[in-house]
């Protein structure tokens, strides 16, 4: 069993989309999970399907949504790092890595889940993935936690190969949907479409709710 898992993503809802089922499987097994969330996603364009947020209220709404999503996934240790949404690419990578390294030293994880650098599509995703790698690279090789990274670029398999970690989350997909639903301001319309596709047994949607895949980060 894993000693401790550290999840590091820049935005509320990244964790639910990318690893919500995997996280729930871990917490159901009694594995301690810490989530370091970089921002409150305050620059997101979605304000709810039937608009209920504005630029002033969205940070507070998304903070509450994040806490509710963590509850659905069984996460009891949530760290909000306080960076500003859509600016992580402009932060000094060592400064961000310092924040992450401090948490690594505190919780001593055996595994870290984050975005694969340059395969996160969004600049914040790539910046946070780079910062995680920088933080872990400072550790002696024999002490480094394994990094299971999420890759969402279209050419990911051509560049990285097939994912070497594929988790069957079918027994907890309802918790993944609950976590996604907690991020209502961002996901309400998407989930209505998802539930319709589930009802119609859409193959791609059913696969998405059954499997989560990761690439073990390869050190140079």
From Swiss-Prot:
InterPro entries: BshB2, GlcNAc_PI_deacetylase-related, LmbE-like_dom_sf. Zn(2+) binds at residues 11, 14, 125. It holds the Pfam family PIG-L. SUPFAM superfamilies: LmbE-like. The keyword Zinc applies. Involved in bacillithiol (BSH) biosynthesis. Catalyzes the second step of the pathway, the deacetylation of N-acetylglucosaminylmalate (GlcNAc-Mal) to glucosamine malate (GlcN-Mal). Has weak activity compared with bshB1. This is Probable N-acetyl-alpha-D-glucosaminyl L-malate deacetylase 2. It comes from Bacillus cereus (strain ATCC 14579 / DSM 31 / CCUG 7414 / JCM 2152 / NBRC 15305 / NCIMB 9373 / NCTC 2599 / NRRL B-3711). The lineage of its organism: Bacteria, Bacillati, Bacillota, Bacilli, Bacillales.
